Design a protein with these regions (language model features):
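Active-site-adjacent C-terminal substructures of enzyme catalytic domains
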Residues: 134-135, 143-229
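Alpha-helix C-cap/termination motif
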Residues: 29, 60, 100-101, 154, ...
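Metal-coordinating catalytic core of metallo-dependent amide/deamination hydrolases
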Residues: 3-20, 24-25, 32-145
């Protein structure tokens, strides 16, 4: 939660300067398009601030940036044991404001045993779809608790991580036409397993993409060339 605290404390203009530096580094490595997620605010004010930074950068920087709203990235201490209430807050207060202001095209959620369960994720994603957002989901990074199955059922654009995906999840992604967004640099830095990409392609004909997952907690690299290797 240290990053959440620092993001809340940092002024909009300073966040823009930091973000511009990251984008410049990415462009120097040949990247011309990227996705940027919120998720280090966990409250409406800071989530909106992050999305406005993304919009400013998309307007002013040569990088083509796709914005994803992800308030359901973690569970703050005050919401532990009250995750249903937090999901309701996301659905009833946060998402409608983001949609009205046109700050994001996508919504994402971290479906994991220690974060949000599959039922909570379904409620969240159904509301996002109702409001016109396209769907993404962080699934099966630590345990397979139904996130990838849900991604297929909801026909999400992508499901991220998928390190622990099971047979049911593989089948659901394939049937739902979901892109498996595999993040090998995160596995590298955490010393974790890699997603079963070969099975995804050969046995289930799942479209596979890769990305850096550049973030302060689990992947300090924004080098897509490193990821591809």
């Amino acid at each position: 939660m240290d990053t959440v605290r620092k993001t809340r404390e940092t002024a909009f203009d300073e966040l823009c300067i930091k973000t511009q530096g990251f984008l410049d580094q990415m462009m120097s490595l040949g990247v011309t398009s990227c996705e940027a997620k919120s998720g280090y605010g966990l409250d409406l004010e800071t989530e909106l601030k992050m999305l406005r930074v993304i919009r400013r950068m998309n307007d002013e920087h040569p990088m083509d940036i796709c914005a994803t709203f992800m308030p359901a990235h973690a569970v703050e201490e005050k919401w532990k044991g009250r995750e249903d209430e937090y999901i309701r807050l996301c659905c009833e207060e946060m998402m409608p404001q983001v949609r009205r202001q046109g700050l994001a095209d996508y919504v994402d959620i971290f479906t994991e045993d220690s974060v949000f369960n599959a039922d909570q994720s379904r409620t969240y994603l159904e509301k996002a779809r109702e409001l016109g957002f396209k769907l993404r989901i962080h699934a099966d990074e630590i345990e397979a608790i139904g996130g990838s199955v849900l991604a297929g059922q909801m026909k999400a654009v992508s499901a991220e991580h998928l390190i622990k995906i099971d047979e049911a999840g593989l089948g659901s992604l394939s049937e739902g036409g979901v892109t498996a967004m595999c993040l090998p640099a995160t596995s590298f830095y955490l010393g974790a397993d890699f997603a079963p990409v070969r099975r995804m392609i050969d046995e289930f004909q799942i479209p596979v993409a890769t990305a850096t997952d550049f973030n302060p907690g689990s992947c300090p690299s924004l080098n897509l060339q490193f990821v591809m290797n």
